[in-house]
Protein backbone atom coordinates (compact mmCIF):
# COMPACT_ATOMS: atom_id res chain seq x y z
CA UNK A 1 0.00 0.00 0.00
CA UNK A 2 1.21 3.45 -0.79
CA UNK A 3 0.85 6.07 1.95
CA UNK A 4 1.27 9.62 0.69
CA UNK A 5 1.08 12.73 2.83
CA UNK A 6 -0.58 15.52 0.87
CA UNK A 7 -0.26 17.82 3.86
CA UNK A 8 2.27 17.32 6.65
CA UNK A 9 2.71 20.29 8.98
CA UNK A 10 3.15 18.53 12.34
CA UNK A 11 -0.47 19.03 13.35
CA UNK A 12 -1.85 16.95 16.22
CA UNK A 13 -4.71 15.62 14.10
CA UNK A 14 -4.68 13.62 10.88
CA UNK A 15 -7.15 12.77 8.14
CA UNK A 16 -6.26 9.28 6.91
CA UNK A 17 -8.08 8.55 3.65
CA UNK A 18 -8.14 5.11 2.03
CA UNK A 19 -9.09 5.55 -1.64
CA UNK A 20 -10.83 3.10 -3.90
CA UNK A 21 -9.23 0.72 -6.37
CA UNK A 22 -7.12 2.25 -9.09
CA UNK A 23 -6.59 5.61 -7.45
CA UNK A 24 -3.43 7.49 -6.48
CA UNK A 25 -2.44 10.63 -4.60
CA UNK A 26 -3.98 12.81 -7.33
CA UNK A 27 -7.48 11.51 -6.63
CA UNK A 28 -8.41 14.02 -3.99
CA UNK A 29 -7.15 17.05 -2.17
CA UNK A 30 -8.09 17.74 1.42
CA UNK A 31 -6.91 20.88 3.17
CA UNK A 32 -8.58 21.10 6.56
CA UNK A 33 -7.23 23.58 9.08
CA UNK A 34 -5.22 22.00 11.91
CA UNK A 35 -5.11 18.58 10.20
CA UNK A 36 -2.39 16.78 8.31
CA UNK A 37 -3.62 14.57 5.47
CA UNK A 38 -2.45 11.17 4.26
CA UNK A 39 -3.87 9.31 1.27
CA UNK A 40 -3.59 5.50 1.14
CA UNK A 41 -3.90 3.78 -2.23
CA UNK A 42 -2.64 0.90 -4.41
CA UNK A 43 -3.55 -2.23 -2.50
CA UNK A 44 -1.28 -4.48 -4.56
CA UNK A 45 0.57 -4.88 -1.28
CA UNK A 46 -1.46 -4.39 1.90
CA UNK A 47 1.50 -3.60 4.18
CA UNK A 48 0.78 -0.55 6.30
CA UNK A 49 3.50 1.50 7.97
CA UNK A 50 1.84 2.59 11.20
CA UNK A 51 4.97 4.35 12.49
CA UNK A 52 4.06 7.31 10.25
CA UNK A 53 1.20 8.07 12.63
CA UNK A 54 2.75 7.68 16.09
CA UNK A 55 2.81 11.41 16.86
CA UNK A 56 -0.87 12.09 16.16
CA UNK A 57 -3.31 12.56 19.01
CA UNK A 58 -6.44 12.10 16.87
CA UNK A 59 -6.95 10.37 13.53
CA UNK A 60 -10.09 10.63 11.42
CA UNK A 61 -10.28 7.65 9.05
CA UNK A 62 -12.24 7.67 5.80
CA UNK A 63 -12.56 4.65 3.54
CA UNK A 64 -14.03 4.93 0.08
CA UNK A 65 -15.06 1.94 -2.03
CA UNK A 66 -12.25 -0.68 -1.90
CA UNK A 67 -10.58 1.55 0.69
CA UNK A 68 -13.22 0.44 3.22
CA UNK A 69 -11.86 -3.10 3.01
CA UNK A 70 -8.21 -1.97 2.99
CA UNK A 71 -8.69 0.26 6.03
CA UNK A 72 -10.65 -2.41 7.88
CA UNK A 73 -7.97 -4.99 7.38
CA UNK A 74 -4.93 -2.82 8.07
CA UNK A 75 -6.21 -0.75 10.99
CA UNK A 76 -7.70 -3.54 13.09
CA UNK A 77 -4.40 -4.25 14.86
CA UNK A 78 -2.68 -0.86 14.71
CA UNK A 79 -3.80 0.64 18.02
CA UNK A 80 -3.92 4.17 16.60
CA UNK A 81 -5.82 7.05 18.25
CA UNK A 82 -8.78 6.87 15.86
CA UNK A 83 -11.37 9.50 16.73
CA UNK A 84 -13.85 8.62 14.00
CA UNK A 85 -14.14 6.24 11.07
CA UNK A 86 -16.39 6.82 8.08
CA UNK A 87 -17.05 4.20 5.38
CA UNK A 88 -18.18 5.61 2.03
CA UNK A 89 -19.73 3.32 -0.62
CA UNK A 90 -17.69 0.29 0.36
CA UNK A 91 -17.80 -2.96 2.28
CA UNK A 92 -15.50 -5.14 4.36
CA UNK A 93 -16.54 -7.97 2.01
CA UNK A 94 -15.19 -6.66 -1.31
CA UNK A 95 -15.58 -9.81 -3.39
CA UNK A 96 -18.78 -11.51 -2.38
CA UNK A 97 -22.01 -11.98 -4.28
CA UNK A 98 -24.37 -10.69 -1.57
CA UNK A 99 -22.34 -8.00 0.23
CA UNK A 100 -19.71 -6.92 -2.28
CA UNK A 101 -18.77 -7.34 -5.92
CA UNK A 102 -19.94 -10.58 -7.48
CA UNK A 103 -16.83 -12.78 -7.95
CA UNK A 104 -17.73 -13.37 -11.60
CA UNK A 105 -17.91 -9.61 -12.27
CA UNK A 106 -14.64 -9.07 -10.40
CA UNK A 107 -12.88 -11.72 -12.51
CA UNK A 108 -14.29 -10.28 -15.74
CA UNK A 109 -13.00 -6.85 -14.71
CA UNK A 110 -9.52 -8.36 -14.40
CA UNK A 111 -9.77 -10.31 -17.65
CA UNK A 112 -11.18 -7.48 -19.76
CA UNK A 113 -9.42 -4.45 -18.25
CA UNK A 114 -8.13 -2.02 -20.87
CA UNK A 115 -8.26 1.73 -21.53
CA UNK A 116 -11.79 1.55 -22.95
CA UNK A 117 -13.24 -0.61 -20.15
CA UNK A 118 -11.58 1.62 -17.53
CA UNK A 119 -13.16 4.69 -19.11
CA UNK A 120 -16.57 2.98 -19.03
CA UNK A 121 -16.02 1.94 -15.39
CA UNK A 122 -15.10 5.49 -14.37
CA UNK A 123 -18.10 7.00 -16.17
CA UNK A 124 -20.44 4.63 -14.35
CA UNK A 125 -18.73 5.31 -11.05
CA UNK A 126 -19.15 9.07 -11.44
CA UNK A 127 -22.84 8.87 -12.27
CA UNK A 128 -23.08 12.13 -14.21
CA UNK A 129 -21.23 13.98 -16.95
CA UNK A 130 -20.36 16.80 -14.55
CA UNK A 131 -18.91 14.44 -11.95
CA UNK A 132 -16.98 12.59 -14.64
CA UNK A 133 -15.47 15.83 -16.01
CA UNK A 134 -14.33 16.74 -12.49
CA UNK A 135 -12.98 13.23 -11.87
CA UNK A 136 -10.93 13.22 -15.09
CA UNK A 137 -9.07 16.33 -13.93
CA UNK A 138 -8.01 14.48 -10.77
CA UNK A 139 -7.83 10.92 -12.01
CA UNK A 140 -5.08 8.44 -11.36
CA UNK A 141 -1.95 8.38 -13.50
CA UNK A 142 -1.41 4.66 -12.96
CA UNK A 143 -1.00 2.24 -15.87
CA UNK A 144 -3.57 -0.36 -16.87
CA UNK A 145 -1.10 -3.09 -15.90
CA UNK A 146 -0.72 -1.55 -12.43
CA UNK A 147 -4.49 -1.45 -12.01
CA UNK A 148 -4.83 -5.05 -13.15
CA UNK A 149 -2.12 -6.20 -10.73
CA UNK A 150 -3.92 -4.42 -7.92
CA UNK A 151 -7.14 -6.29 -8.71
CA UNK A 152 -5.31 -9.63 -8.86
CA UNK A 153 -3.64 -8.93 -5.52
CA UNK A 154 -6.89 -7.90 -3.86
CA UNK A 155 -8.56 -11.04 -5.18
CA UNK A 156 -5.75 -13.19 -3.78
CA UNK A 157 -5.84 -11.50 -0.37
CA UNK A 158 -9.61 -11.76 -0.08
CA UNK A 159 -9.42 -15.50 -0.84
CA UNK A 160 -7.21 -15.85 2.25
CA UNK A 161 -10.22 -14.87 4.39
CA UNK A 162 -8.85 -11.57 5.58
CA UNK A 163 -11.77 -10.78 7.87
CA UNK A 164 -11.64 -7.75 10.09
CA UNK A 165 -12.68 -6.67 13.55
CA UNK A 166 -12.30 -2.97 12.75
CA UNK A 167 -15.39 -0.95 13.66
CA UNK A 168 -16.79 1.82 11.45
CA UNK A 169 -18.88 4.60 13.01
Where are these regions (language model features)?
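Conserved HGGG/HGGXW glycine-rich cap/lid loop of the alpha/beta-hydrolase fold
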Residues: 1-48
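Active-site signature of alpha/beta-hydrolase-fold catalytic machinery across serine-
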Residues: 30, 73-77
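Short, flexible active-site-adjacent loop segments at beta-strand->alpha-helix junctions, enriched
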Residues: 65, 91-92, 127
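Catalytic His-Asp charge-relay segment
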Residues: 165-169
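Helix-loop "lid/cap" segments that line or gate small-molecule binding pockets
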Residues: 105-109, 119-130
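Gly/Ala-rich beta-loop-alpha elbow adjacent to hydrolase catalytic centers
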Residues: 62-72
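Structural motif
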Residues: 14, 58-60, 84
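Flexible "cap/lid" loop of the alpha/beta hydrolase fold
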Residues: 76-112, 140, 147-159
Amino acid sequence: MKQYFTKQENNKSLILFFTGWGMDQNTLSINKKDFDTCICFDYTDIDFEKSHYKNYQAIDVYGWSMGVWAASYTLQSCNLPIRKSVAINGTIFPIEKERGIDPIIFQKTIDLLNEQSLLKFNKRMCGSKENFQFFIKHSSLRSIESLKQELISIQSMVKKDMTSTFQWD
